[in-house]
Swiss-Prot record:
Residues 210-310 form the HTH araC/xylS-type domain. This is Transcriptional activator RhrA. It comes from Rhizobium meliloti (strain 1021). Transcriptional activator of the rhizobactin regulon. GO terms for molecular function: DNA-binding transcription factor activity; sequence-specific DNA binding. The keyword Protease does not apply. PANTHER family: ARAC-FAMILY TRANSCRIPTIONAL REGULATOR (PTHR43280), TRANSCRIPTIONAL REGULATORY PROTEIN (PTHR43280:SF31). Residues 228-249, 277-300 bind DNA. InterPro entries: Homeodomain-like_sf, HTH_AraC, Tscrpt_reg_AraC-type_HTH.
């Protein structure tokens, strides 16, 4: 089975010319041809991480802590680029529109036209490219949140960036596992659009199931959340909801359990020893720790504590 792993690029001793070549090659398939102009000094010592899957590309670049501009030509496809600066505000000029985002806030940007990206204080720059074909069923959904700053405090956005961070930090992933994580990444886009863009679920493709899954995602931490809660919110019967999930070869309860276990696994891998296993279990809606441990081991073939230990040793 093919193994997918992030690429660590650059070193603190890498000279300016080589740093520029590395940055160009990394950003080429995300922003198009890009020229980087620091206000002072050069790009000596740039480092970062790059991860690529067939339907998602991710990069984190650690630029010098000085004002710099990135002039990007854009891509040939009509996909979406997600941008974030962690050490600086972010200023973007795109098609005569200027957008400013605070430190750690996020901007969704069309990838098919040139842009000028300014980091007044330089530092860490995060970028994701979502190709057009992967967004086919979600393009209209994203329109209300394009080209506006999205606050870092938004919970669906935090989940989205946590998935991206996990993919960039995890040393080894099977193609199957990477595909599952990317699918979850895309599943969060309707949730984000609903939370920020105030998009009615009935305006989106596959509206009912997308709305149901959105409600599940928003209530994973609620241990008492049930199919009855969804039925009341959607104004349909629990039986109708079960029919929707039956068409996907599962049940409501199995879907919720799978999402909770998947989120728990991501948090275990991403947070290291910062949060206890029991707290993670409760945070994703499990009220019984022994049940969590049992179902987690049944699904992934390893106990949560052993997974954390293996990840730390990798």
């Amino acid at each position: 089975m093919e193994t997918i792993r992030p690429l660590k690029f650059g070193t603190l001793s890498l000279p300016d010319r080589e740093s520029r070549l590395v940055c160009r090659s990394i950003l080429l398939d995300m922003l198009g041809e890009a020229t980087i102009a620091p206000d002072e000094g050069d790009l000596t010592g740039v480092t970062g991480l790059f991860w690529k899957y067939v339907s998602l590309s991710l990069a984190t670049v650690y630029f010098p802590r000085t004002m710099l501009r990135v002039n990007a030509s854009g891509m040939g496809d009509s996909g979406v680029v997600i941008l974030r600066a962690m050490d600086s505000p972010l200023v973007i000029r795109h098609r005569r529109i200027k957008v400013e985002a605070a430190r750690a806030d996020v901007i969704f940007l069309p990838s098919d036209a040139s842009s000028e990206i300014t980091l007044p204080e330089g530092g860490r720059f995060d970028c994701a490219h979502l190709p057009a074909y992967a967004l086919a069923s979600k393009r209209d959904l994203l329109k209300p949140i394009m080209m506006q700053p999205l606050a870092a405090e938004c919970l669906p956005l935090q989940l989205l960036t946590n998935y991206a961070g996990y993919l960039l930090r995890q040393e080894y992933q099977s193609e199957e596992h990477a595909g599952m994580m990317v699918a979850h990444f895309y599943d969060l886009l309707p949730v984000l659009a609903q939370d920020i863009g105030n998009v009615s679920p009935r305006e989106t493709p596959h509206n009912r199931m997308a709305s149901i899954k959105m409600r599940v995602e928003q209530n994973l931490a609620n241990g008492s959340f049930s199919i009855t809660d969804v039925a009341e919110a959607e104004r349909i019967t629990p039986r109708a909801i079960q029919k929707f999930f039956s068409r996907e070869g599962t049940t409501f309860s199995r879907y919720v359990l799978g999402r909770r276990l998947s989120l728990a696994k991501s948090l275990i891998l991403a947070e290291g020893e910062a949060t206890s296993i029991s707290q993670i279990a409760y945070n994703v809606g499990f009220n019984d720790l022994s049940y969590f441990n049992r179902t987690f081991r049944s699904r992934y073939g390893v106990r949560p504590s052993d997974l954390r230990r293996l990840a730390a040793a990798a």
